[in-house]
């Protein structure tokens, strides 16, 4: 549109006809809500990162005066601000909740969530109903973050602040490790649930809570029980009972104040965060030793969450019109509970009160279900008036620790043995706040505890001389002369390395746990064939190590990766390309005693599109599961594409099928997968009722050519993936394909090599 007259009154920008410009209007996702979310493979690029490309957070953290930061945090704890005054004159309870809710989003099934990237700063977490008032906690921290700049990330600072809060109130913590680098945008890969209302649970459970209207529902009290308790079969990978909660509803299931039923929710959700019963009791009781909840009045007084609040609030949300809107008038959860007589001092008073009184159901001023002690005196201090005392109160979920038989045994033991309680809480708190950091190799700082814990997936430190280039060459020759095929070598290496999850940094080739339970028995690894490969590689390892006289050794973990790399080189050579796959020795072999079988069970892939494997049917499509797997492997869309295409022609399908093996020369590293997938002479049609298998027939003659899965055809169907596939299908692409495949392959093999970084 052109304004020929130069009359500004006719300019569409100034007259409102072009008010909505870049990134506005109806989006692709509005038209096609089930469109494949390839976008999760291009998160956290340099385009969103304001720091220089050569910034190394680990190196920056090493220059931090951690003691000075902790000293400043100690001062902050009792430096009450008029704009958000501290309960009992101490911010400890608020900061413990901030750290807990930062870490507590972690879940074991996919390793996502957790404190590792400072996601509490971004939507949706910054606006969850369970995070009301944590906007204030982070703003209280801003002067300290501002002072130390990029030497400490928000992710580390939030957890450190929780530790200092505990220490400032007389508790000895287990330790602290830095190393959590910030990201600069929300993580779009996390599935938080399908509900479209806050506090909804109708999708994650059968007949669950409907939640509350979108423009309201900022506290759990808004979701009141209707007397029905739905099926408690929580959807995986979720670890929270309702949309916008961290774990459980403190009033009980869907607001039903039943401590026994609540215990079932607690056990399920805390278990999905990797906590056993003892750790769960310790965490709840330890956290509730401090501070209070806030429910001074109805949530009708509370305005919109941060992401929906006005510009003038500058990132604050939940503006409260009741009284002063702060201090004694604060509204957070809608509950009004202070658990102990000394809410700013570590004690055993939580358990003392829990068992000393009988409890009757009551309601907070906001209308939330809570419990009050019967026949008790007012012994609980007021947060802002030293002349006031209150009756002891508890949450429904607190009473679960007394009324659930298993929790009750642990709680009584902690009541009678305060030292055991303190030790259990210190360990559980450390696990809570460090669970998603991965191996100890990532831990930074002087406060890292020396004790090695099983949940850290320990791997022995290198205690021998590493192999050199000549050794690598000789070992490759032995591997290629062992009788093992290229596909066997590549498949074993992929099975070992592809367990890595970028979410919680677990899994990977280091440790060679592919030879141990449970991984050696996973269906996706084709146990019988895997055992053959490992047996021959172990023989090569034993012979090599026995032949050395200078202390040099090769670990099986290194040898598995080296074997895969040798297979890739041979496959490229057989296709006419002379290449070298880079290899860095230094992996070690973990023992069965260093491996938590149950915990590693969560790493078993329900689907691995790279091996054309899918274990069970689910509501999630095969292609969505492929994107999810690629995201966990930290792959970009081009890396996903070139890797899958290369692995197909290398013939490593889990079941040995020819699905997607679009080549007449399997075992050679060629771009045949892409050439044949995009061949217009092939016509595809579903050959299974579930549309998981497709036949590719000659368009002219009808003669069968190929069999494919959804994980194959998506590279011709999805417009973004097809655009990449076309690059690798081009006649000039062979060299690029081989080089890009090797680069992506090496990346996966080294995903857990934090020592190389």
Curated annotation (Swiss-Prot):
Entry's cofactor comment: Binds 1 heme b (iron(II)-protoporphyrin IX) group per dimer.
Residues at the catalytic site: 101 (proton acceptor)
Function of the protein: Bifunctional enzyme with both catalase and broad-spectrum peroxidase activity.
The protein, known as: Catalase-peroxidase
Site positions per UniProt: Transition state stabilizer: 97
Region ranges (Disordered): 1-28
Catalytic activity: H2O2 + AH2 = A + 2 H2O; 2 H2O2 = O2 + 2 H2O
Quaternary structure and partners: Homodimer or homotetramer.
Cross-link (Tryptophyl-tyrosyl-methioninium (Trp-Tyr) (with M-273)): 100-247
Gene designation per UniProt: katG
Residues where heme b binds: 288
Example GO molecular function: catalase activity
UniProt keywords, alphabetically: Heme, Hydrogen peroxide, Iron, Metal-binding, Oxidoreductase, Peroxidase
